[in-house]
């Protein structure tokens, strides 16, 4: 119950600003979430330290933050939301634009260990904006289960949790890297094809994946990914009637579209 503070030395995710912890099994597969009573009282960010952190982890942080707007807006659809989750939904819409505007230059600055406005804007987006959205859009383990909600993540993270079943992917590819491919799968599932094209362009511009092969997965792995997805809390908040078959098709269609996209860039 004591107040605590966080001092993130990486901008690889929003963990330092949230009241959510992810628990994994000993083999690296996703197990469950742990919900804290409150997030840190204050999060201190030193952009010089972030600029000197490993570029690959900063890059993965961009991929993770990329999911926030799309997942929250998708998960909230057609839900009768009260003030707090509604505030989170509105704030989520501020997550993608900074990544597209500053992300590529921020990566260059991180590569050169230069503290800059680009680094600052991306670090704030990855750690603070997405972290606040997480805090506003999750309310679990209430005395009355009808008061529970979980809009913080959705199908993009479902791809990640399914991918964690495969050591060839989970051991060699970072969380945000895999999630960024999941964003494309969500957009396919939701038939947002114009937006998917924009994210293909963005991912490709900074080296994030556009296909299964780039994260060491194959078409044969997809049914197991979808089956794992159907077991996590995010699945219960997919709009309409979530379907493993539809999700399998969305992942395969994304992979096909990604291959076609990359072929045109050769």
Which stretches of residues belong to each language-model region?
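A short secondary-structure junction motif
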Residues: 69, 73-77, 106, 129, ...
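Active-site segments that bind and position negatively charged phosphate/pyrophosphate groups
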Residues: 81-202
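Intrinsically disordered or highly flexible coil/loop and linker segments, enriched in small
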Residues: 75, 79, 108, 112, ...
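A glycine/threonine-rich phosphate-anchoring loop and its flanking beta-alpha core
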Residues: 2-95
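C-terminal charged capping/lid subdomain of soluble metabolic enzymes
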Residues: 192-266
């Amino acid at each position: 119950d004591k107040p605590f503070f966080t001092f993130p030395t990486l901008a690889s995710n929003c963990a330092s600003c949230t009241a959510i912890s992810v628990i994994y099994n000993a083999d690296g597969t996703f197990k469950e979430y742990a919900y804290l009573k409150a997030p840190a009282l204050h999060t201190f960010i030193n952009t010089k330290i972030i600029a000197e952190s490993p570029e690959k982890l900063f890059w993965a942080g961009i991929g993770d933050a990329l999911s926030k707007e799309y997942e929250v807006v998708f998960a909230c659809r057609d839900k009768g939301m009260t003030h707090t989750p509604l505030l989170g939904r509105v704030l989520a819409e501020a997550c993608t634009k900074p990544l597209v505007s500053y992300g590529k230059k921020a990566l260059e600055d991180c590569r050169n260990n230069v503290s800059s406005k680009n680094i600052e804007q991306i670090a704030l987006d990855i750690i603070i904006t997405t972290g606040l959205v997480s805090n506003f859009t999750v309310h679990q383990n209430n005395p009355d289960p009808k008061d529970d909600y979980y809009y913080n993540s959705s199908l993009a993270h479902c791809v990640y949790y399914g991918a964690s079943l495969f050591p060839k992917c989970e051991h060699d590819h970072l969380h945000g890297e895999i999630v960024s491919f999941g964003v494309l799968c969500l957009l396919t599932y939701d038939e947002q094809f114009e937006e998917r094209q924009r994210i293909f362009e963005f991912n490709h511009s900074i080296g994030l994946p556009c296909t299964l092969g780039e994260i060491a997965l194959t078409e044969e792995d997809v049914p197991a990914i979808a089956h794992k997805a159907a077991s996590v809390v995010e699945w219960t908040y997919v709009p309409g009637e979530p379907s493993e078959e539809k999700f399998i098709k969305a992942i395969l269609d994304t992979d096909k579209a990604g291959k076609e996209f990359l072929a045109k860039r050769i």
